Amino acid sequence: MSIGFLRQALNALQQQSRSRTSHRVNQWFKWLSPGLSIKRWLLISVGGVLLAILGLAIWVKLTPIFWLLELVRGFLGAVANILPNYISGPLVILGGLLLLLWGQTRTVGSITQVLRPGAEEELIDVLLAHRRLYRGPKIVVIGGGTGLSTLLRGLKTYSANITAIVTVADDGGSSGRLRQEFGVLPPGDIRNCLAALADEEKLLTELFQYRFRAGDGLTGHSFGNLFLTAMSDITGDLERAVAASSKVLAVRGQVLPATLSDVRLWAELADGRRIEGESSIPKAGGKIVKIGCIPANPPALPAAIKAIKEADYIIIGPGSLYTSLIPNLLVSDIADAIAQSQAPRIYVCNVMTQPGETQGYTVADHIRAIDAACGERQLFDAVLVHKKSPSAQSLIRYAQQDSHPVFLDREAVSQLGRRIVLANVLYEDKTGFVRHNPQKLAKVLLKWYGGAHHGK
């Protein structure tokens, strides 16, 4: 074995040791970060130790303390002869503080090992993230379908004060079957939002989204839908079922149904037909001229109205225009609360038109449809539009389904009194499937909120 090899090994060990030491010291000093409410308790602990020493001194009539002080005095005198007091003093103080901090962190670490076994993150990092997220803005997001859950995955990294208000008009697929067989409100969109906001382990979220592929009566159902249906029966209604499920998944924020009424959508088409049922409307293949619900003006969930009134920021969309977004706004109390809000409000327009709902629609057409459904009230101040067109591969794929990019007609949008926010927020996979990128979308929305909020 050569001397050079040994030297390299020793250098590698030294670098690794320095790296570990630096990381540990960095983790210790994180406990002194502002906003954690740690430093005050640390100072109280130090005060308690000093007070206990003083009490002990009084109890033993101070005699041993004098001996100890004389010993310390002699030691300090010897140190002062070697190092000046302006150097030795701060060094001793720093050493004492490091020992105290090290002892505190090791104590907390021992407790954490029991409470959070196998956790990959350091407790201090969890605390810092928790403080940052729970100091984030109160954001209300309104919509449904995959568009809403995509946005929530991005927003939850900026704030834990998120309220997702979700449509309950779905009557297709697993949700529709459960609605028909058990008389429960459709849980599908709520399940997707809970999974998107979940802060629990990935395996638990995957379990919630698991869809059965076989089994008499189980095929097509997702575990989360069945879980929410069972919880609704146990707790008495969907609102309490969602609250209980949120605890299981450690959800950041809350998910609320727009209403607890059994809502059924209807649409009038340009050819005079009237189509009933959320899943039947896109299949009808006509131009939608009017949309409503049975019963008309269903009562809003009080918690949803409260969240809107307290919101710092309101986001509408993305999602299917007529079957995910507008059904929430047909609950007149929700539309009223949004209209009266002084918070910054923005609409996230879809990237592509949707067959059976918005063929040929421009950005302005989307805005007009929302305004018409809400009695021509202006529920948002700006519209977020994707800047670039998808790839040729995606355009060909979507054209086969009669779906095309939503055209931005700037002048028409400006005439409707809306500001335009242009940004690259698209995600495109290898097969040409496009959707909003959760992280990019959330970043752009929070940046616009910062400008709108400070501009007030």
Swiss-Prot record:
InterPro entries associated with the record: CofD, CofD-like_dom_sf, Gluconeogen_factor
Entry keyword Cytoplasm: yes
Gene Ontology terms: cellular component: cytoplasm
Keywords: Cytoplasm
CDD domains xref list: YvcK_like (cd07187)
DNA-binding is among the record's keywords: no
Annotated SUPFAM superfamilies: CofD-like (SSF142338)
Biological-process GO terms, alphabetical: regulation of cell shape
Main localization, broad class: cytoplasm
Gene Ontology MF term list: LPPG:FO 2-phospho-L-lactate transferase activity
Classification via Pfam families: CofD
Localization annotation: Cytoplasm
HAMAP family referenced in this protein's UniProt entry, alphabetically: Gluconeogen_factor
Function comment: Required for morphogenesis under gluconeogenic growth conditions.
Family membership noted in the UniProt record: Belongs to the gluconeogenesis factor family.
Name of the featured protein: Putative gluconeogenesis factor
